[in-house]
Structure formats: structure tokens, C-alpha cells
Amino acid sequence: MTSNAELADWCQRQSEDAARQIELFGGGGVRAILEMPDGTTQDITAGVVAHQTDNIAMFARLIAALTA
């Protein structure tokens, strides 16, 4: 069974990874492009940044609950 401390550590690592993705995609240097089966593409960079921003907030709440 995983302890609360181990879960909090995992959440912290996930949060750090999300922050790295925001740094990578948020600066405009790297874009996330989704290629559809029909060959069309869609830029999903803004969605990736928004999703990772939400993840950081969620992981912060989980860490707080696990370490309270």
C-alpha cells in the first residue's frame, strides 16, 4: 500500500512535469500539433498549457490534503 507521503511525492513530481510543459509550450517556441486521420492538423498548444495549468492547481490541492 502506498503511503500519503509517497502519494504527495508523486503529486509533486507530476506538478513539476506540468510546469516544465508549460515552460516548453507557453513560450511559443514549441507547438503541439495534432494530426487527424484525414491528414488535417490542429494546433492544440493553448489547450496543453491550459490543461497543465489546471493540473498544477489540482496537484497542489492533493498535496495539501495528503500532508495535512
Located regions from the model:
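Short E/K-rich amphipathic alpha-helical oligomerization segments
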Residues: E16-G47
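Amphipathic alpha-helical coiled-coil segments and their boundaries
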Residues: N4, C11, P37-T53
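Amphipathic alpha-helical coiled-coil segments
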Residues: Q21-I22, I44-A68
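Short, charged, intrinsically disordered terminal tails
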Residues: S3-L7, V30, A64-A68
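Short, charge/polar-rich alpha-helical segments
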Residues: M1-E23
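Low-complexity, intrinsically disordered/propeptide-like segments
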Residues: W10, G27, P37-G39, L62-A65
